[in-house]
């Protein structure tokens, strides 16, 4: 064995090596010749030349051993010349004898313990190899280090490589192989990695310069006692098990899922989170790893708030403004402008504007009659009605009067239904019974048939077969809807609409160009004249019949016009004409001075949309516009008035029909009474007589027919009569017997 020790006398700048086989030692001086250093046996060395005079008791370097004390000259074990004869060991010498450099030189290789430990290097590679002979003789890279024992070489063949451990192989530039049989590989470029479908990238140190290996393909090692590495996006430190455990704990804990901070639930690794929407307002879609959230085209929400606006299932409410809820519409005392004309029909729910409301008021006033009218400011002056010579100022009161009269009529009808009959109204026939086959139809007379819905058939053999048709008279026929056949043998034909006619190249439109039915007073080859026709109204909208005197007046007017055409042509207003003589759609008025505008005076009120208006109409229009603006109400009022209009139209239309029908029937009844009262029979015994009579009351006429019989003894008298008025027939019978 060899050992290295420093004498306790002085730990100076020299070393002494004893291999354990010599009694003396191998020694050397230090650079400044302070003293020799060697084995020391405890005796103080004398001051002689070999101790350089520094071994005296007074010297600060006292107790430094002498050559003799280190073995003595007799043994020749510690002599300076030993270096010339020594072959089995390395000698360390200073420069006191001028035989060696000032540094330690170990030669090309160092072998310790008979070669079991060696140290070698290469001058060319500047590498170092420490270990067994196999390691020392193995290949080496530039500036590499190989440390290893055993029969298998530890090789650091890569430049700047390090191999430590038996058979360790560091074959790549800058690589490190640590441990038994560890081998290195080329470094791998790791830009990213995919774990469970998740791509991780942007790694620090993703492009390593070399590798450190602590094993091989089959031999693996654990690295223990690793300090915790820095954990950051730029860190390239190794991490230990505790750090990975913390990551594992965190990963295993997953993450928490809450909704509005409530209902917390854990989502762990491997769990699936399903995204869904129950109300359909969100449309969720997934493409690859992307989840898209979109609003549905039709949102379904319970309520919605936007600023001061609130919308829910009850409707829309604007704070301090309008609202539209299931309870109705509240305009919030604000005006609604630019409302287009809404449809005004039985089924319409459109909003209407002020102009429509004004027209409604005007229409209501017209239908109310009784001098009702609309003022310029839109207000309505109520009507006054006269029912049976009594005046009423309200519809309610008028209805009361009508109801009173209807009650009287109902009493009369009740008497008829009860078999009491009507005075002076009788019927006599031995023919087939009448048949009212249509819904709400009336049939009167022998073999009279009313088969159309709402039809009326009166007279022997009369036929009313179409909807709303009326056949009045013997064998009268009304096969066309809403048509009337008047008189015996009369027959209606298909309705023909006459839109207008052209006179002298000018086309004229006719009113009543959409007739709903026709009235026939005869048939082909059996025509009738209509006499006693009252003069009808003559206007652009009139549909009244005109009589002969009116046509005569027209003829006279035409003759007068023809006489004055020539003279009037000089002063007439004419159309401008094209160069070919055809008329233009313009007129140029010119008086005595062509430079002075012409004033049109006494201009009538325009009627149609293209008629000229006069100043009065213009002022009225402006006044109406202002009145409409003042009368404009909110949406609720409009709807209410719209409903009131429809209701009023319906009720007043029905009322008008009932009143007219009641008035006509009352007058007809009076006429029938007069006609029946005028019948006279022969009172002579055994006589059968026939009578005819007529009656007229307030524009309604009636005809009565009757048969009378007086017995031979004049005790028994009987009669049978029938009367007609306005297409309605009545029958009556009477019988008397004298007992004494």
Swiss-Prot record:
GO terms for cellular component: cell outer membrane; cell surface. This is Autotransporter adhesin BtaE. Residues 648-686 are annotated as: Outer membrane translocation of the passenger domain. Residues 12-647 are annotated as: Surface exposed passenger domain. Disruption phenotype: Deletion mutant exhibits a reduction in the adhesion to HeLa and A549 epithelial cells compared with the wild-type strain. Shows an attenuated phenotype in the mouse model. Residues 1-11 form the signal peptide. The gene is btaE. InterPro entries: Adhesin_Head_dom, Coiled_stalk_dom, Pilin-like, Serralysin-like_metalloprot_C, YadA_C. Keywords: Cell adhesion, Cell outer membrane, Membrane, Protein transport, Signal, Transmembrane, Transmembrane beta strand, Transport, Virulence. SUPFAM superfamilies: Adhesin YadA, collagen-binding domain, Pili subunits. Belongs to the autotransporter-2 (AT-2) (TC 1.B.40) family. Pfam families: YadA_anchor, YadA_head, YadA_stalk. The keyword Signal applies. The signal peptide, cleaved at the inner membrane, guides the autotransporter protein to the periplasmic space. Then, insertion of the C-terminal translocator domain in the outer membrane forms a hydrophilic pore for the translocation of the passenger domain to the bacterial cell surface. It comes from the Bacteria. It comes from Brucella suis biovar 1 (strain 1330). It is found in: Cell surface; Cell outer membrane. The lineage of its organism: Bacteria, Pseudomonadati, Pseudomonadota, Alphaproteobacteria, Hyphomicrobiales.
């Amino acid at each position: 064995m060899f050992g290295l020790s420093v004498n306790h006398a002085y730990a100076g700048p020299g070393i002494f090596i004893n291999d354990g086989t010599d009694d003396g030692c191998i020694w050397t001086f230090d650079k400044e010749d302070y003293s020799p250093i060697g084995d020391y046996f405890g005796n103080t060395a004398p001051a002689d030349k070999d101790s350089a005079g520094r071994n005296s008791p007074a010297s600060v370097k006292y107790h430094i051993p002498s050559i003799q004390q280190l073995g003595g000259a007799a043994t020749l074990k510690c002599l300076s010349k030993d270096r010339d004869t020594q072959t089995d060991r390395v000698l360390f010498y200073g420069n006191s004898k001028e035989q060696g450099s000032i540094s330690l030189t170990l030669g090309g290789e160092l072998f310790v313990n008979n070669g079991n430990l060696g140290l070698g290097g290469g001058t060319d590679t500047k590498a170092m190899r420490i270990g067994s002979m196999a390691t020392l003789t193995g290949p080496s890279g530039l500036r590499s280090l190989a440390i290893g024992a055993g029969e298998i070489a530890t090789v650091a063949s890569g430049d700047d490589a390090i191999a430590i451990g038996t058979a360790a192989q560091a074959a790549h530039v800058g690589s490190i192989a640590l441990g038994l049989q560890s081998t290195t590989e080329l470094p791998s470029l790791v830009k990213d990695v995919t774990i469970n479908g998740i791509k991780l990238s942007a790694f620090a140190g993703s492009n390593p310069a070399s590798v450190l290996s602590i094993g091989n393909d089959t031999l693996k090692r654990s690295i223990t006692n690793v300090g915790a590495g820095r954990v950051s996006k730029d860190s390239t430190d190794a991490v230990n098990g505790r750090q990975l455990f913390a990551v594992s704990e965190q990963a295993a804990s997953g993450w928490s899922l809450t909704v509005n901070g409530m209902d917390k639930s854990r989502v762990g690794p491997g769990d699936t989170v399903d995204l869904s929407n129950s109300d359909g307002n969100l449309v969720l879609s997934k493409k690859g790893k992307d989840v898209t959230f979109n609003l549905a085209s039709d949102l379904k929400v319970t309520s919605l708030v936007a600023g001061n606006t609130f919308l829910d299932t009850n409707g829309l409410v604007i704070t301090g403004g309008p609202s539209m809820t299931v309870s109705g519409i509240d305009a919030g005392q604000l005006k609604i402008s630019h409302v287009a004309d809404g449809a005004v029909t039985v089924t319409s729910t459109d909003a209407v504007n002020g102009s429509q409301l004004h027209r409604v008021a005007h229409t209501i006033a017209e239908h109310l009659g009784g001098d009702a009218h609309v003022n310029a400011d839109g207000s309505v002056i109520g009507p006054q009605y006269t029912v049976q010579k009594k005046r009423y100022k309200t519809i309610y009161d008028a209805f009361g009067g009508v109801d009173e009269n209807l009650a009287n009529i109902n009493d009369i009808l009740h008497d008829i239904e009860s078999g009491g009959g009507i005075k002076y109204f009788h019927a006599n026939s031995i023919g087939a019974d009448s048949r009212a086959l249509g819904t709400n139809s009336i049939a009167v007379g022998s073999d009279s048939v009313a088969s159309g819905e709402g039809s009326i058939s009166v007279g022997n053999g009369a036929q009313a077969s179409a909807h709303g048709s009326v056949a009045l008279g013997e064998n009268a026929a009304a096969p066309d809807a809403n048509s009337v056949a008047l008189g015996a043998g009369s027959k209606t034909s298909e309705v023909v609409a006459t839109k207008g006619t052209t006179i002298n190249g000018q086309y004229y439109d006719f009113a009543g160009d959409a007739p709903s039915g026709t009235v026939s007073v005869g048939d082909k080859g059996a025509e009738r004249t209509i006499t006693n026709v009252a003069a009808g109204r003559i206007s652009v909208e009139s549909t009244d019949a005109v009589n002969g005197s009116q046509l005569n007046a027209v003829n006279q007017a035409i003759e007068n016009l023809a006489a004055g055409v020539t003279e009037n042509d000089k002063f007439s207003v004419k159309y401008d004409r094209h160069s070919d003589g055809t008329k233009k759609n313009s007129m140029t008025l010119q008086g005595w001075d062509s430079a002075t505008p012409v004033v049109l005076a006494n201009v009538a009120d325009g009627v149609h949309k293209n008629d000229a208006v006069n100043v009065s109409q213009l002022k009225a229009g402006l006044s109406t516009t202002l009145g409409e603006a003042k009368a404009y109400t909110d949406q609720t009022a409009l709807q209410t008035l719209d409903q009131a209009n429809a209701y009023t139209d319906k009720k007043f239309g029905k009322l008008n029909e009932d009143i007219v029908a009641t008035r006509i029937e009352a007058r007809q009844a009076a006429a029938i009474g007069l006609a029946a009262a005028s019948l006279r029979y022969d009172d002579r015994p055994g006589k059968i007589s026939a009578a005819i009579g007529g009656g007229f009351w307030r524009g309604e006429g009636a005809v009565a027919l009757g048969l009378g019989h007086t017995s031979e003894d004049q005790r028994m008298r009987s009669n049978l009569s029938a009367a007609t008025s306005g297409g309605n027939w009545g029958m009556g019978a009477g019988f008397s017997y004298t007992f004494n």
